[in-house]
């Protein structure tokens, strides 16, 4: 992806590009909030959090994968462990990733809430930070169940970083809108429009492959209301997160 951003920035926009890789979602939100980043590629829920703190941020693009601008979380359990179905999670630890992650926290936690399982009341919430850490911990039996991005899970299986024989698939979450591409609202209109066009009109399969998408479709803030609804299910006050 870094290479793709350089190509777009310096090749298409004719502008020098500085790539900033933040350590986690929270630091990226703060960098965007205080204007240290002009273009940001957020996780869906981290975008919602960022938008609540910096309303001027504008989503404009979303990656399309397998013909869809969305993805899902997968809830998994240790194959030979005590969790055979969702109901078995009650009274046990459950692993999530980053607190601001959509597919390894918000979506699966909302999914469990809709099944009558409330975090830290019906099961112990464990945060492991990264998607792959969740998969590895569950496969090793360190925690009996957990959740991560279904797409990342498939990559971990395909690259043999986790053994699917050691895992049981419990459920998939409802569809989640893909990661939004965002731009600072304070940029000059002509630059902002040029950035949006550079992404939305992108057809080069080589560059798209670097983004790990088939195409980039237009996105609006309203597309992410589903995340705000999930937060309501969990009684989360987005403004205070």
PLM regions: where:
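Acidic, polar ligand-binding/catalytic clefts
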Residues: 30-88
């Amino acid at each position: 992806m870094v290479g793709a951003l350089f190509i777009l920035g310096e090749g298409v926009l004719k502008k020098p590009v500085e790539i900033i890789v933040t350590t986690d979602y929270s630091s990226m939100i703060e960098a965007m909030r205080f204007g240290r980043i002009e273009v940001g590629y957020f996780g869906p829920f981290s975008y919602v959090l960022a938008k609540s703190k910096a309303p001027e941020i504008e989503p404009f693009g979303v990656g399309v994968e397998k013909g869809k601008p969305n993805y899902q979380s997968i809830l998994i359990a240790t194959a030979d462990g005590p969790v055979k179905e969702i109901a078995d999670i009650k009274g046990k630890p459950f692993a999530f990733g980053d607190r601001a992650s959509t597919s390894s926290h918000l979506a699966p936690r909302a999914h469990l809430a809709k099944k009558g399982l409330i975090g830290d009341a019906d099961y112990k919430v464990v945060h492991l930070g990264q998607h792959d850490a969740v998969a590895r911990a569950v496969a090793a039996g360190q925690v009996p169940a957990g959740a991560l991005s279904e797409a990342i899970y498939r990559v971990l299986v395909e690259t043999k970083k986790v053994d699917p024989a050691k895992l049981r698939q419990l459920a998939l979450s409802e569809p989640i809108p893909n990661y939004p591409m965002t731009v600072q609202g304070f940029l000059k209109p002509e630059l902002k429009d040029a950035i949006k066009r550079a992404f939305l009109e992108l057809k080069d399969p080589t560059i798209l492959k670097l983004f790990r998408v088939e195409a980039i479709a237009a996105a609006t803030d309203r597309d992410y209301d589903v995340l705000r609804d999930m937060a309501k299910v969990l009684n989360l006050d987005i403004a205070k997160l």
